[in-house]
Each structure stands twice: as C-alpha cells, then as structure tokens.
Amino acid sequence: MAKGKSKNKFNQSWLHDHINDPYVKMAQREGYRARAAYKLKEIDEQDKLIQPGQVIVDLGAAPGSWSQYARNKLAASPRATGGKPDGAVVAIDILPMEPVADVTFIQGDFREEDVFRQLEEVVMAASGGAKIDLVLSDMAPNLSGVASADSARIEYLCDLALDFAQTHLKPDGALLVKCFHGSGYSQIVEKFKRQFKVVAPRKPKASRDKSSETFILGRYLKVVN
C-alpha cells in the first residue's frame, strides 16, 4: 500500500512539474512537439552547429522536435526561398512519427540492411552524392533501473551513432548524442576522443537538473588508419 502511495505521489509531482515547466509552455506556444527542441536550440546557439545548405540526419527522431528545430533553422537562412529550408533534414526512428514539413522520414531500424540502404539512398539524393554535415541522436533506451544493464544499453546506442557518423560524416562534420552520466560515461567520451578532434560535454538549461542526461558533441573527424 505504501509503495502504491509513493508511486502516485511521484506521478503527481512529475505532472505538476511538467505542467508548470516553462519549456513545455514555450514548446506549446511555438509549435514544437516536445521541450527537447530547446536542448538542441541552446547547444546550436552555443556551437553554431546548423548552417545554411547542410544535410542533417536525425537518429531516433520521434516525436520530431529536433527535426522541427533543424528544419526551421535551415528555413530561416537568408538563402532559403519560399519558406523552404536551405538544406535537408532526414529523420529516422523505429517508432512512427507525424510528418514534419520538408523533412524526409524513414520508419525503421537503421541496423537492418534494407532500412540502412534506404537511408543511404535518401541521404545521397539530398546531398547530391556528398556526405553528411551533422548527425543528431536523441536516442535513449528503455531504462530498467539496473545500472549495469542501463549503462550498456546507453553505450550501445552511442556506438551506433558513432559508427554511422564515422562512415557518413564529412571530415569537418559534427555528431551530437544524448547520453547519461553513469558507469559507462567515461568510456563513451573516450570513444568520441578516438574519433573526433574536438569533444565537448553539453548540459543545456532545458535538460532538467534532476536528470543525469547530458550530451556529447564531437567535431572534425580524425583520419582512421
């Protein structure tokens, strides 16, 4: 009984925080599907990630707020015409996602060969045969509460993003991934350092203080022998 009361109290507390969250209110007002858009916005404003003419891939895109922000930023370019983005955003997720204007969405698991091939074809068409400028990954596993298992799952998703970036990024491209502070965090950072010349942690204000969520940014691929 006490456990049920505790869980109900937690749910009520979360709901209260969510309703009164300024980023939730801002997302509703500005038409973003999730408050996560402001995490990317803050990092982008700090690091100037999204530039006119870029090809951007959003891994684990659903519900779509990162794709929305990237698309809007490209559409705000002085070179953009008719409200269309100057560049391209390609989003992929295992989960379904409501369409985002001017964003190409692929539903599927990019670890599967046919889905990966489809993603490559879409990217090649968008980039004119060139490589990608920016890879975004807000992917997160279903957490079990078992620290060792959760760390392994988080590291695995980061590895997937790193492998994808290594193959498809331009030499001066960038990769931004979500991860969590925990037992595997330092290993993820080391993997980034082996692959990128510049590596930086980011904890935007829109990321809740209570959360161990953080982001790692890698820029400028190292030459892999």
UniProtKB/Swiss-Prot annotation:
<feature type="binding site">
    <location>
        <position position="109"/>
    </location>
    <ligand>
        <name>S-adenosyl-L-methionine</name>
    </ligand>
</feature>
<dbReference type="GO" id="GO:0008650">
    <property type="term" value="F:rRNA (uridine-2'-O-)-methyltransferase activity"/>
</dbReference>
<comment type="similarity">
    <text>Belongs to the class I-like SAM-binding methyltransferase superfamily. RNA methyltransferase RlmE family.</text>
</comment>
<dbReference type="Pfam" id="PF01728">
    <property type="entry name" value="FtsJ"/>
</dbReference>
<keyword id="KW-0808">Transferase</keyword>
<dbReference type="InterPro" id="IPR002877">
    <property type="entry name" value="RNA_MeTrfase_FtsJ_dom"/>
</dbReference>
<feature type="active site" description="Proton acceptor">
    <location>
        <position position="178"/>
    </location>
</feature>
<feature type="binding site">
    <location>
        <position position="66"/>
    </location>
    <ligand>
        <name>S-adenosyl-L-methionine</name>
    </ligand>
</feature>
<comment type="function">
    <text>Specifically methylates the uridine in position 2552 of 23S rRNA at the 2'-O position of the ribose in the fully assembled 50S ribosomal subunit.</text>
</comment>
<feature type="binding site">
    <location>
        <position position="93"/>
    </location>
    <ligand>
        <name>S-adenosyl-L-methionine</name>
    </ligand>
</feature>
<keyword id="KW-0489">Methyltransferase</keyword>
<dbReference type="InterPro" id="IPR015507">
    <property type="entry name" value="rRNA-MeTfrase_E"/>
</dbReference>
<keyword id="KW-0698">rRNA processing</keyword>
<keyword id="KW-0963">Cytoplasm</keyword>
<feature type="binding site">
    <location>
        <position position="64"/>
    </location>
    <ligand>
        <name>S-adenosyl-L-methionine</name>
    </ligand>
</feature>
<keyword id="KW-0949">S-adenosyl-L-methionine</keyword>
<dbReference type="GO" id="GO:0005737">
    <property type="term" value="C:cytoplasm"/>
</dbReference>
<dbReference type="InterPro" id="IPR029063">
    <property type="entry name" value="SAM-dependent_MTases_sf"/>
</dbReference>
<dbReference type="InterPro" id="IPR050082">
    <property type="entry name" value="RNA_methyltr_RlmE"/>
</dbReference>
<protein>
    <recommendedName>
        <fullName>Ribosomal RNA large subunit methyltransferase E</fullName>
        <ecNumber>2.1.1.166</ecNumber>
    </recommendedName>
</protein>
<feature type="binding site">
    <location>
        <position position="138"/>
    </location>
    <ligand>
        <name>S-adenosyl-L-methionine</name>
    </ligand>
</feature>
